[in-house]
Amino acid sequence: MIYVDDAGLMKHDRAWFHLVADSLDELHRFAATLGLPERAFHRGARHPHYDVPDDLRQRAISLGAMPIYTRDAVRISRKLRDR
């Protein structure tokens, strides 16, 4: 399953959100569908994710990503990281 949170962190005059998934393969495939390059993946982060701006968040949801709270995105990412 693919998820996108409600973080809405402001950076460069845009709101940014976290795209996470139950598996890295699924996450990378979905990110590619959105046009995100793999280099945009936060590989060194404590929680594996891609940052997406609001327009891509809306597109992700229309393509099947489940909107979730940020705390749930952190939990999902930690579980993935700890595998």
Feature-to-residue mapping (PLM):
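The feature represents the first ordered module of a protein
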Residues: 1-27
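Non-catalytic peripheral regions of nucleotide-handling enzymes
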Residues: 3, 13, 27-33, 59, ...
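Short, compact, well-ordered microdomains
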Residues: 47-83
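Generic signal for short, ordered secondary-structure residues
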Residues: 9-10, 38-39, 83
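A short, structured beta-strand/loop element
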Residues: 21-46, 62
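Terminal leader/tail segments of proteins
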Residues: 2, 33-40, 57, 68, ...
